[in-house]
Amino acid sequence: MKLTQGAFSFLPDLTDAQVTKQIQYALNKSWAISIEYTDDPHPRNSYWEMWGLPLFDVKDPAAILFEINMARKAKPNYYLKIACFDNTRGIESCVLSFIVQRPSYEPGFKMTRQEVKGRQLVYTLESYSVDAKPEGERY
C-alpha cells in the first residue's frame, strides 16, 4: 500500500529532475527547506526526524539534492520528505511537503474497531510495520 502524505502523493514517485524543479520553486518563493525522515508512516505522525539542520541559506537546488542523496544513502529503508517553510508574517508554517523516498515494501495499515460507551464506534489506524518491529528496524 503506497503511503499518501503531502503533495504529489497520488502521483508516481518524483524523479530527481522533478524534485529539483520543486526545490527551485520553493527557493523562488524564499521558503526554507528541510529534509525529514521516519520509519513510522502513521498519517498523524507529523513529527518526523530532521536530517541535519534546515537549509535556510542554501539557494542552489543541486546542493539540496546532494543532501537528499546523502540522506537516501544513510537511510535507505526510511521515508524521506522535503518540507518547505514560509516565514512570512501571518503564514509562518509549512506550505509544501512531499515524499522523495519510500521503502521498497510498504505493508500498509490495519483498522481496529472498538465499541465504547453508548454503542459508539471508535476507529484506530495502526501500521503493520510498527507492530512487527521496533523503531529503526521496521523496513
UniProtKB/Swiss-Prot annotation:
Key words of the record: Calvin cycle, Carbon dioxide fixation, Chloroplast, Photorespiration, Photosynthesis, Plastid
Top-level taxon of the source organism: Eukaryota
Record localization: Plastid, Chloroplast
InterPro entries the UniProt entry points to: RuBisCO_ssu, RuBisCO_ssu_dom, RuBisCO_ssu_sf
GO biological process: reductive pentose-phosphate cycle
GO CC, alphabetical: chloroplast
Pfam families: RuBisCO_small
Keyword match Transcription: no
SUPFAM superfamilies xref list: RuBisCO, small subunit
Disulfide bonds: none
Gene Ontology MF terms: ribulose-bisphosphate carboxylase activity
CDD domains, sorted: RuBisCO_small
Signal peptide: none
Primary subcellular site in the record, as a coarse category: plastid
Leftover remarks: In this alga, in contrast to plants, the small subunit is encoded in the chloroplast. The basic functional RuBisCO is composed of a large chain homodimer in a 'head-to-tail' conformation. In form I RuBisCO this homodimer is arranged in a barrel-like tetramer with the small subunits forming a tetrameric 'cap' on each end of the 'barrel'.
Similarity comment text for this entry: Belongs to the RuBisCO small chain family.
Subunit structure: Heterohexadecamer of 8 large and 8 small subunits.
Function per UniProt: RuBisCO catalyzes two reactions: the carboxylation of D-ribulose 1,5-bisphosphate, the primary event in carbon dioxide fixation, as well as the oxidative fragmentation of the pentose substrate in the photorespiration process. Both reactions occur simultaneously and in competition at the same active site. Although the small subunit is not catalytic it is essential for maximal activity.
Protein name: Ribulose bisphosphate carboxylase small subunit
